């Protein structure tokens, strides 16, 4: 039946014309939006934790921010333990650590339903330092360090450690108890259940430790390799006798990488929450970090990992593989080369 209504002209109806016109107008805007999203993740990235890992995290944040100026990245340094407390409470997206996460810290995360992906990022060599005027401690053994740092045997004077050393008081500088460097040193030197001497000057700020040792002729202290290399003119690194070979080894990029600087060579980690990775900003940051970890680790004074470890970390990030690989099924910490434990 012919209603008498006029037939539409050939071509699309008026509404379709309007949609096409609108699409043409919006196309450049859509392209601009896609380009901007690819260029700048936006949002926020919250990082805290180890003061040892801080220079690396800061370098990553600086480079990432150049390419993503719309993303707000904050980097704190409250120590490995302090960082995990905030991380377990859901206050941060990334937690830097100079040691693997502990079983108790994992339980704290579980209590708040915080799942995480574990990412190794670099090697470090915990460095024993003295004042440059110290011309007697040419090398040091783990047993001598124990004599200095263990509370029950704490040597008060250098001659108490070695009779050939001067009759001068020992001034000890140490990272604070929230520091992963403190935990690592204590475990290696005095044992997990050992107590460190109580008269140490402690600080979570490695620069404070540098100034302390640099200003005291009879001082001894320890911190990460990057802070040593940054301040090598102010303090002197003491070669450590490798317990297996009996040879004194100075921390360098080569000796840390090949494992001869033992027992103080160690991997550094960044932990990222699964909830954080749901944010484009955090996923973009984590991917950028792993893409550039080797070069930035070297740039700030650490030692890059073998590429196979970065590849494994990228695969674990992509798969959102949660949990730690540094604790065995029996609940005990795993030791040995990280390439054998991290898969």
Give the label of every model feature segment:
Residues 1-44:
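Short, low-complexity disordered leader/linker segments with a strong preference
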Residues 35-343:
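Flexible loop/hinge segments at secondary-structure junctions
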């Amino acid at each position: 039946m012919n209603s008498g209504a006029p037939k539409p002209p050939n071509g699309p109806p008026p509404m379709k014309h309007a949609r096409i016109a609108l699409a043409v107008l919006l196309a450049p805007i859509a392209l601009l939006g896609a380009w901007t999203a690819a260029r700048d993740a936006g949002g926020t990235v919250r990082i805290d934790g180890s003061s040892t890992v801080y220079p690396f995290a800061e370098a990553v944040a600086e480079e990432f921010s150049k390419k993503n100026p719309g993303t707000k990245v904050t980097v704190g340094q409250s120590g490995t333990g302090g960082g995990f407390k905030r991380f377990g409470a859901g206050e941060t997206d990334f937690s830097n650590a100079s040691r693997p996460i502990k079983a108790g810290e994992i339980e704290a995360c579980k209590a708040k339903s915080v799942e995480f992906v574990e990412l190794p990022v670099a090697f470090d060599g915990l460095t024993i330092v003295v004042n440059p005027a110290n011309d007697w401690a040419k090398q040091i053994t783990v047993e001598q360090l124990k004599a200095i740092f263990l509370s029950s045997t704490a040597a008060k004077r250098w001659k108490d450690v070695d009779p050939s050393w001067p009759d001068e008081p020992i001034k000890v500088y140490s990272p604070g108890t929230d520091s992963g460097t403190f935990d690592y040193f204590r475990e290696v030197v005095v044992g997990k259940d050992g107590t460190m001497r109580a008269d140490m000057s402690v600080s979570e700020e490695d620069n404070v430790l540098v100034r302390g040792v640099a200003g005291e002729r009879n001082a001894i202290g320890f911190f990460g390799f990057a802070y040593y290399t940054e301040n090598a003119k102010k303090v002197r690194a003491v070669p450590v006798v490798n317990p297996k070979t009996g040879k004194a080894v100075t921390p360098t990029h080569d000796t840390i990488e090949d494992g001869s600087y033992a027992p103080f060579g160690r991997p550094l980690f960044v932990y990222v929450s699964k909830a954080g990775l749901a944010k484009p900003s955090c996923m973009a940051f984590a991917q950028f970090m792993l893409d550039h970890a080797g070069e930035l680790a070297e740039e700030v004074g650490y030692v890059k990992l073998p590429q196979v470890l970065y590849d494994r970390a990228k695969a674990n990030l992509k798969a959102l593989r949660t949990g730690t690989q540094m604790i065995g099924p029996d609940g005990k910490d795993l030791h040995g080369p990280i390439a054998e434990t991290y898969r």
